[in-house]
């Protein structure tokens, strides 16, 4: 390949994958690749995958099939990363003969070398886990991209082994980055114009617990909050059992810490929570919610719900609905249970019929839709501080997020990107808010 080389990245799954895709783009920029939004003109296509549910995994294979003919028509390299890559490894190269390279969740640092080999016709898979401190030194950072928000990885992996979850098998055990590296990365990002950071990890609340002498997650938040020029701090994802009183106190004491937390309950029944190996009861979860709201009364809480878990009775399911009503989530991600390889739940009996699971999922989503619309309507007439991120998808409005992580669209000058502005909310929609500048600028 000579001259300009174009890279297209398709990202499936969570915010960690979005962050990893940013790092992929940064690494390959050093190999002469610039990004394109059009896969049909790309010289290299990277598909960053998710395997949390079977549906997401099947979607990846379907997506890869689109490029078989394209590769016959012209010179094109195709790579797969992320959790499906980690899970399948060499099998992906055999199953998808038109695939050139496969890299796992711990192997991003090898990507430049693998691409160079692929350019010479060599197919490779690299999916070795690095479950020790050495992997911390291999975290590639995304380039300064000119945006006002930034994802910052603070830890990787998970040690909880919830019975339904494949994450420990495809992301590895928990390892925390050194706080000095995290703080240095954020200082550099702020110097480049970033005003908001989202701290990422499969279980951010356990940050530092396995590293002698390291800060706790609450301590890390306090250090980051002291960085001049940084306006807002967010984090995801939190495991309810690991939320400490020290962390809850941060919501009362740190104005830069945004008033939103993603707190996955997964179910409202103690028997199902126990079968899921979640490590808390319904009451313990509700006590954490109450403590968070005592610390920050206006905090908005989002969550995850799984329906159709093996053995879930109608009574168990009704407990989930009642939990949702008691918490009053702003929004949730809701899913039908999906058996995953290697997980403990995959061998459980008492499977729920698909029809019943689908019906329960519809009831969950209907209840949440009503609560979300009601919650959004409650913001109409209020004035919200919005960090302007840029132009909306429609292109004729600005968009940004409130402290509580709600998307707001409004008319304004594009030069406001990166600014905190007051927006009066005029209308609530299921997925966003509409507003107008309180003082037109």
From Swiss-Prot:
EC number(s) reported in the record: 2.8.4.3
Pfam families the UniProt entry points to: Radical_SAM (PF04055), TRAM (PF01938), UPF0004 (PF00919)
Subcellular location: Cytoplasm
GO molecular function terms listed in the Swiss-Prot or TrEMBL record: 4 iron, 4 sulfur cluster binding; metal ion binding; N6-isopentenyladenosine methylthiotransferase activity
Cofactor(s) the record lists: [4Fe-4S] cluster
TRAM domain span: 377-439
GO cellular component: cytosol
Highest taxon in the source lineage: Bacteria
Free-text remark on how the cofactor is bound: Binds 2 [4Fe-4S] clusters. One cluster is coordinated with 3 cysteines and an exchangeable S-adenosyl-L-methionine.
Spans through the membrane: none
Keywords noted in UniProt: 4Fe-4S, Cytoplasm, Iron, Iron-sulfur, Metal-binding, S-adenosyl-L-methionine, Transferase, tRNA processing
Catalytic activity, reaction form: N(6)-dimethylallyladenosine(37) in tRNA + (sulfur carrier)-SH + AH2 + 2 S-adenosyl-L-methionine = 2-methylsulfanyl-N(6)-dimethylallyladenosine(37) in tRNA + (sulfur carrier)-H + 5'-deoxyadenosine + L-methionine + A + S-adenosyl-L-homocysteine + 2 H(+)
Enzyme class: transferase
Residue ranges constituting the MTTase N-terminal domain according to the UniProt record: 5-120
Residues annotated as binding [4Fe-4S] cluster 2: 158, 162, 165
PANTHER family found in the cross-reference section: CDK5 REGULATORY SUBUNIT-ASSOCIATED PROTEIN 1, MITOCHONDRIAL TRNA METHYLTHIOTRANSFERASE CDK5RAP1
Family statement drawn from the similarity comment of this UniProt entry: Belongs to the methylthiotransferase family. MiaB subfamily.
Subunit structure, interactors included: Monomer.
Protein name: tRNA-2-methylthio-N(6)-dimethylallyladenosine synthase
Native source species: Geobacter metallireducens (strain ATCC 53774 / DSM 7210 / GS-15)
Lineage: Bacteria, Pseudomonadati, Thermodesulfobacteriota, Desulfuromonadia, Geobacterales
């Amino acid at each position: 390949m000579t001259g300009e080389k174009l890279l297209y990245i398709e990202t499936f799954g969570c915010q960690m994958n979005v962050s990893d895709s940013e790092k992929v783009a940064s690494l390959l920029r050093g190999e002469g690749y610039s990004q394109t939004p059009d896969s049909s003109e790309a010289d290299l296509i990277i598909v960053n995958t998710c395997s949390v549910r079977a549906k997401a995994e099947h979607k990846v294979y379907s997506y890869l099939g689109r490029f078989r003919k394209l590769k016959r028509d012209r010179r094109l390299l195709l790579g797969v990363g992320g959790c499906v890559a980690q899970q399948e490894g060499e099998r992906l190269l055999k199953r998808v003969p038109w695939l050139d390279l496969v890299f796992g969740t711990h192997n991003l640092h090898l990507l430049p070398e693998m691409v160079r080999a692929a350019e010479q016709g060599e197919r490779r898979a690299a999916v070795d886990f690095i479950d020790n401190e050495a992997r911390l030194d291999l975290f590639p950072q995304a380039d300064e991209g000119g945006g006002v928000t930034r994802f910052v990885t603070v830890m990787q992996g998970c040690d909880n082994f919830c019975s339904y979850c494949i994450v420990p098998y495809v992301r590895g055990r928990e390892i925390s980055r050194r706080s000095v590296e995290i703080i240095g990365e954020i200082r550099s990002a702020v110097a480049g114009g970033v005003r908001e950071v989202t701290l990422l990890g499969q279980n951010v609340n356990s940050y530092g617990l396995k590293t002698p002498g390291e800060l706790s997650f609450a301590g890390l938040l306090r250090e980051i909050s002291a960085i001049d020029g940084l306006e807002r701090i967010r984090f995801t994802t939190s495991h309810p059992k690991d939320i400490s009183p020290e962390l809850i106190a941060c919501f009362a004491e740190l104005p830069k810490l945004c008033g939103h937390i993603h707190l996955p309950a997964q179910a409202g029944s103690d028997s199902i929570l126990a079968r899921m190996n979640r490590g808390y009861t319904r009451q313990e979860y509700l006590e954490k919610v109450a403590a968070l709201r005592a610390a920050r009364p206006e905090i908005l809480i989002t969550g995850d719900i799984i329906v159709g878990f093996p053995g879930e009775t109608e009574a168990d399911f009704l407990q989930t609905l009642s939990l949702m009503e008691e918490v009053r989530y702003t929004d949730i991600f809701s899913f039908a249970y999906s058996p995953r390889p290697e997980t403990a739940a995959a061998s459980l009996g008492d499977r729920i019929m698909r029809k019943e699971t689908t019906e329960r999922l519809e009831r969950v989503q209907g209840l949440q839709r009503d609560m979300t619309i009601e919650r959004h309507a409650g913001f109409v007439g209020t004035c919200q501080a919005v960090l302007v991120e840029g132009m909306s998808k429609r292109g004729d409005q600005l968009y940004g997020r409130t402290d509580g992580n709600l998307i707001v669209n409004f008319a304004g000058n594009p030069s406001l990107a990166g600014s905190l502005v007051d927006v009066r909310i005029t209308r609530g929609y299921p997925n966003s808010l509409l507003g107008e500048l309180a003082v037109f600028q």
